[in-house]
Regions:
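Glycine-rich phosphate-binding active-site loops on the catalytic face of alpha/beta enzymes
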Residues: 78-89, 116-129, 159-198, 236-244
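Alpha-helix-loop-beta-strand connector modules within alpha/beta enzyme cores
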Residues: 47-65, 90-102, 130-153, 192-199, ...
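N-terminal glycine-rich anion-binding loops that anchor highly charged ligand groups
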Residues: 25-31, 231-244
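Glycine-rich phosphate/dinucleotide-binding loop and adjoining beta-alpha-beta core of small-molecule
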Residues: 250-302
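Active-site mouth loops of central-metabolism enzymes
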Residues: 4-20, 96-98, 153, 209-218, ...
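N-terminal beta-loop-helix "entrance" segment that forms/cooperates
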Residues: 43-51, 242-259
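Catalytic cores of alpha/beta
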Residues: 22, 61-76, 80, 100-111, ...
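Catalytic beta/alpha-barrel core
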Residues: 10-13, 32-45, 54-107, 113-119, ...
Length: 302
């Protein structure tokens, strides 16, 4: 199974002009799977739709209806829901299911490749579908192993909520309203790229280096970034001082103010789930106080 965080897009329930082209772009940009949910569709319409894609593209598709067509057209998965809960004879593709509480997750987890849990946030596409869980409930479910890499978050998912979703232990995120509200925007492609990049970075441990900046790259944050990269991490930095040095000597340093150091740590913490911190040069008492305050504020792992 894909070790990266999964990004899944569900189609809108109705047919849209230009939908095939949009889906092809989504698949080319690297979404994990496309879930095809068209509850009112007729079989000829679904056949026409599936015939519009290559075999490789259909392998990334998961059907919510017409499971026999999934077999016939080589789709990669089928998704159980209140309408359809059968498994075609001889089916060996992916199998997924929608869940709406923790009891369902525990009951179905062993039988499926992955499960959707909804609604994590207030729905964007469905009025009246409010979030069903508190943050504390999701944290507890993660700690108890109920939410794990085989459970994907659905409901109100947007790019700026992914860090929170992945911090709760979800193995993927399921988009619907957020994606389709942007499909005709000139920034659609860049937004999808940002979503996928966020998912990729969530899989790579983010390590924060708090240290001086060495223009020769032999020490300081520059050296730390190389080391972090070499062990498979993603390096983040908060510079405590600008140093005037080379590989032979340090001539002098210019301390960064307490507030500026704190602001650096704050902005990276807003964007990334920091998994470790490496502390180097802290040239003044102010910089020591800034780091102590940041460690207390953001609860970085030991």
């Amino acid at each position: 199974f894909n070790p990266l965080k999964a990004i899944i897009v569900i189609t809108e329930p109705f047919w849209r002009v230009g939908e095939v082209e949009v889906i092809r772009v989504l698949l080319q940009l690297g979404i994990t799977y496309l879930h095809v949910r068209k509850p009112q569709a007729k079989e000829p319409e679904m056949r026409t739709f599936l015939s519009s894609f290559s075999a490789d593209e259909r392998e990334k598709m998961v059907l919510h209806d017409f499971f026999d067509l999934a077999q016939e057209y080589g789709c990669g998965g089928i998704h159980h829901n209140s309408r359809n809960q059968t498994i075609p004879l001889g089916w060996n593709g992916r199998l997924s299911r929608s869940c709406h509480n923790f009891l369902e997750l525990k009951s179905y987890k062993a039988a499926y490749d992955y499960l959707f849990l909804s609604s994590i946030f207030d729905s964007i596409s469905k009025e009246g579908y409010s979030c069903a869980f508190t943050a504390d409930e999701l944290d507890k479910a993660h700690q108890e192993g109920i939410i794990d890499k085989s459970v994907y978050a659905l409901g109100g998912i947007t790019q700026d909520r992914l860090a929170e979703v992945f911090a709760w232990g979800f193995g993927g995120a399921v988009f619907l309203g957020d994606i389709w509200s942007r499909w005709d925007s000139p920034y659609f492609v860049s937004y999808i790229q940002s979503v996928i990049k966020t998912a990729q970075l969530a899989t790579i441990p983010s390590i924060l280096s708090i240290a001086g900046s060495d223009p020769s790259s032999g020490a300081g944050v520059q050296a730390d970034l190389k080391t972090i990269s070499s062990i498979g991490g993603y390096g983040l930095t908060a510079i405590s001082a600008l140093t005037i040095q080379n590989t032979q000597r340090v001539e002098r340093f210019i301390p960064i103010s307490k507030n500026d150091l704190l602001d650096q740590i704050r902005v990276v913490s807003e964007d990334f789930s920091v998994k470790g911190v490496k502390i180097g040069m802290l040239p003044t008492l102010d910089s020591v106080e800034a780091v102590v305050e940041a460690l207390q504020t953001y609860s970085f792992p030991n």
